[in-house]
């Protein structure tokens, strides 16, 4: 019994040290418009100022302006079709009676910023990515990315 207790204490201590030393952080930014809300969630390394993942969640409230429901759904579906097959990008879309939603997750380590074929296939998506993920000194800088999106009226969620 004492051996199990000692082993458990050692494992908890090791876990505490590993988690305590991690410099990974998460930040959220929101852009609220009349009928839409865009949330950007960055996962980044504080010490290295490098982004590892970006999640974009776009929600269109169709109860606020039903005239544009089909146009929004069509535009979302076009963007999804463009994104299919781009390495490092996953997405989910959801429709219900009140909302049209698109969630895009970008794995910065796998995503190819300079892939000309993908860039030509999905110009709207790449323009959004280049706004939200700013490269500096061969990394995607969290601070530079944050400053860029704040210029587009995103607000940091504290």
Role assignments for model-derived ranges:
Residues 18-20:
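C-terminal motif of bacterial Sec signal peptides marking the signal peptidase cleavage site
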Residues 24-158:
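Subset-of-secretome marker
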């Amino acid at each position: 019994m004492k051996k199990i207790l000692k082993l458990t204490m050692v494992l908890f201590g090791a876990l505490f040290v590993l988690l305590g030393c991690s410099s990974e952080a998460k930040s959220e930014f929101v852009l609220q418009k009349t009928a839409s809300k865009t949330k950007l969630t960055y996962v980044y390394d504080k010490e290295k100022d490098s982004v590892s993942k970006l999640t974009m969640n776009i929600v269109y409230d169709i109860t606020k302006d039903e005239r544009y429901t089909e146009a929004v759904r069509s535009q979302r579906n076009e963007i999804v079709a463009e994104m299919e097959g781009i390495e490092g990008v996953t997405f989910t879309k959801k429709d219900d009676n009140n909302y049209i939603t698109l969630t895009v997750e970008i794995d910065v380590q796998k995503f190819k910023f300079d892939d000309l074929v993908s860039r030509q296939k999905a110009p709207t998506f790449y323009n959004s990515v280049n706004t939200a993920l700013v490269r500096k000194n061969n990394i995607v800088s969290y601070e530079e990315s944050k400053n860029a999106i704040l210029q587009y009226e995103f607000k940091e969620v504290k």
